[in-house]
């Protein structure tokens, strides 16, 4: 395994461990534990949630192990820089308005005897007894990071994408301009839609938008979509195309159905291209950071741009570029 790939894998495990405890675990400690237990964030998270014993910080042996581990040091420096940058941004906005782990970093006996895990369990267990904290421990023990899939769209770069993000941190960064965005509002989403006709009970899929009606392929009734579906890579597989050509009541639809609705726009890529309109139908709101969250496992931080795919593939990001443009 190359040193760069090793750093990526270590970073992913550290981000996952910290996300399970909402960023309450220090970066140094998280990196040390992931090196010690071969990036097994599931096991470590479970033991932290179960532990309640003494209280201590990193001892000299642990600190020496990190100092002699270049991979761990690089990950620590990167994550700390991200955290510091986030804190500086928050403070500014408020004021204005290949080496492996060293021998000492290897696992010490069992997790139940690990002082670092014990210390974390003790410190986290004295948190106030709230529903949110209880939910955090329950989810950590069950190896869960609650997440949802959302559509994002960058107006300045004219691109849209789908991403699975934590429920507590619904934000995604555009890979081109690096700006952070909130999800497209649910009532403004567009793309491959799923329809259920209340008149003929027909179920079908086609391009649509949540705030616009499309004709049923069966009875031609004008109906709203039930939901917008994330594109699937399997749509790129060769095979017969759908029998029904796209058609809607939008004024500028390339295959318009009458009576059309004046002033409405078609979201089908053919119509957008024919009418020389931007790809993005409704842009994401710009994300305003509260400074209350950290860059964790499902955030868009990466070692370098070319390494992004390793992390994105791991969390199954799906881009509209991967979808079939026909309906």
UniProtKB/Swiss-Prot annotation:
Residues 82-91 have a biased composition (Basic and acidic residues). GO terms for biological process: innate immune response; negative regulation of translational frameshifting; regulation of translational termination; response to interferon-beta; viral translational frameshifting. One of its GO terms (molecular function) is ribosome binding. It is found in: Cytoplasm; Nucleus; Cytoplasm, P-body. Keywords: Cytoplasm, Nucleus, RNA-binding. InterPro entries: SHFL. Belongs to the SHFL family. This is Shiftless antiviral inhibitor of ribosomal frameshifting protein homolog. It comes from Danio rerio. The gene is shfl.
């Amino acid at each position: 395994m190359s040193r760069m790939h090793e750093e990526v894998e270590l970073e992913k495990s550290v981000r996952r461990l910290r996300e399970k405890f909402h960023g309450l675990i220090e970066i140094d400690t998280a990196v040390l534990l992931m090196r010690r237990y071969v990036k097994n964030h599931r096991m470590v998270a479970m033991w932290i949630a179960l532990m309640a014993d003494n209280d201590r910080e990193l001892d000299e042996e642990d600190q020496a192990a990190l100092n002699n581990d270049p991979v761990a040091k690089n990950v620590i420096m990167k994550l700390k820089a991200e955290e510091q940058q986030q804190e500086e941004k928050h403070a500014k906005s408020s004021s204005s308005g290949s080496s492996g782990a060293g021998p000492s970093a290897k696992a010490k006996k069992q997790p139940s005897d690990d002082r670092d895990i014990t210390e974390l369990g003790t410190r986290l267990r004295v948190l106030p007894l709230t529903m949110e904290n209880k939910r955090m421990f329950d989810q950590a023990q069950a190896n869960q990071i609650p997440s949802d899939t959302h559509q994002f769209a960058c107006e300045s770069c004219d691109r849209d994408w789908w991403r699975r993000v934590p429920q507590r941190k619904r934000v995604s960064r555009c890979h081109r301009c690096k700006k952070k965005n909130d999800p497209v509002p649910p009532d403004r989403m567009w793309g491959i839609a799923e329809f259920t006709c209340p008149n003929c009970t027909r179920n079908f899929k086609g391009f649509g938008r949540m705030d616009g009606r499309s004709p049923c392929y069966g009875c031609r009734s004008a109906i709203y979509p039930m939901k917008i579906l994330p594109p699937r890579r399997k749509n790129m597989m060769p095979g017969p195309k759908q029998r029904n050509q796209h058609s809607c009541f939008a004024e500028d639809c390339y295959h318009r159905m009458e009576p059309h609705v004046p002033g409405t726009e078609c979201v089908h890529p053919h119509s957008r291209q024919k009418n020389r309109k931007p790809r993005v139908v409704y842009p994401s709101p710009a994300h305003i950071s509260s400074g209350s969250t950290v860059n964790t496992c499902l955030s868009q931080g990466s070692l370098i741009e070319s390494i992004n795919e390793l992390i994105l593939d791991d969390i199954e990001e799906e881009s509209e570029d991967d979808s079939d443009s026909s309906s």
